[in-house]
Amino acid sequence: MHSNTAVIALSALAALVPAALAGGNLGTANVQNACGKDVYLWSIADSAGEKMITLKDGETHSEQYRANSNGGGISIKMATNPDHKDISQFEYTVSEPQVFYDLSNIDGYPFAEGGVSIHPSDSSCPAVVCEGGVKECKEAYNQPKDDHATHGCPQETDLNVVLCAGGGSAGPKKMFKPVQEKAANRPRHPHARPE
């Protein structure tokens, strides 16, 4: 009897998360391809069954922030091959009134040659800059406990990711210096397992 009540309560709570997100002013996640060749994206909520997006050079994929059904974050998996292997992940989680974001290279870093950057539309929020030619970006997750790589901004802030931001066949892009953020204000990685 108690388990049925708990299941009903959790189901109702899970249904409220997307509704709560719809009620506020939410920003947009944008991923721009500056690599000079096609790149492949998968915007993942609950499962890896989402459709592959082929992003041609110069194109941008945009999506308004959303949540998965358990209230967790979204992972936009980014690759240079359509086989869903060797991926970088742009991850965001809306937790009113903020959006938390990071770049994860735990499952590969196919953009090491050209680099990756994340520039929030709110200039007071920290940028993430992984310069081209660097095999391990210190501003990204390279190990599961690299929590220094998670940043937060107001939830209405757009997050602009540029793939091959530091080069590629499309040439170098303007690089921005990231704003330093106090370590005490950083949350744990939004997709991390509990300790």
Curated annotation (Swiss-Prot):
Residues 1-22 form the signal peptide. Disulfide bonds join C125-C153, C130-C137. GO terms for cellular component: extracellular region. It is found in: Secreted. Residues 185-195 have a biased composition (Basic residues). Residues 171-195 are annotated as: Disordered. Pfam families: Bys1 (PF04681). The keyword Disulfide bond applies. SUPFAM superfamilies: Osmotin, thaumatin-like protein. Keywords: Disulfide bond, Secreted, Signal. Might be involved in the inhibition of growth of fungal competitors and pathogenicity. Belongs to the thaumatin family. This is Antigenic thaumatin-like protein ARB_01183. It comes from Arthroderma benhamiae (strain ATCC MYA-4681 / CBS 112371) (Trichophyton mentagrophytes).
